[in-house]
Amino acid sequence: MPAIAPLASPPQSQEQLLAQARQLAGYSLGELAALAGIPIPRDLKRDKGWTGILLELWLGASAGSKPEQDFAALGVELKTIPIDSRGRPLETTFVCVAPLTGNSGVTWESSHVRHKLQRVLWIPVEGERTIPLAARRVGAPLLWSPDEDEERQLRMDWEELMDLIVLGEVERITARHGEVLQLRPKAANSKALTEAIGARGETILTLPRGFYLKKNFTAALLARHFLLQHD
């Protein structure tokens, strides 16, 4: 393979970003970590975001965990997605933290979820636990925007979930709500509480929530673009 190097500054165009991402396809995480001079953990138990951080480094990302997209100047969000040997997602995909208060007047068009999913660079990475972390390979990237049908599905779920939040029913929401988008606790520990609206309109303390794309949504998306068998 030709010698490659991390981008020293944020990419200037979507084409440059995609070209760099394509260069990473086929490399293992261990090879990319060594070339970038960063240590690789034994596993992801305590370093869950490590794969994303490594690829952000290679692609010149700028946003970190801020509300804007990873490549804010390009309007592109980076999402690494662990896949099995058949190219299917192994887990749900975090989109953004859900606002539990101050939601009067918020619409789908102005929502963080829509903003984050307007343009996404998906990078599949081997994720099966039988493969050592350093040996897991990076797959071919996909630069994606939701089509009309996908946007409709996302909007319907978002509106249903936000209605429940505004009506003070956040604690009734389960991961089963929503066809393609779900809401579930985001905190690493149960002591990190945040304010929300209770059933009688009072302020309550609850776990922070995050929006996640369900596996059926990302599986269909990958299958369609990479011509995989989707069942």
From Swiss-Prot:
Gene3D superfamilies: DNA mismatch repair MutH/Restriction endonuclease, type II. The keyword DNA repair applies. One of its GO terms (cellular component) is cytoplasm. It comes from the Bacteria. It is found in: Cytoplasm. Pfam families: MutH. Its main location: cytoplasm. GO terms for biological process: DNA modification; mismatch repair. InterPro entries: DNA_mismatch_repair_MutH, DNA_rep_MutH/RE_typeII_Sau3AI, DNA_rep_MutH/T2_RE_sf, Restrct_endonuc-II-like. Keywords: Cytoplasm, DNA damage, DNA repair, Endonuclease, Hydrolase, Nuclease. GO terms for molecular function: DNA binding; endonuclease activity. Sequence-specific endonuclease that cleaves unmethylated GATC sequences. It is involved in DNA mismatch repair. This is DNA mismatch repair protein MutH.
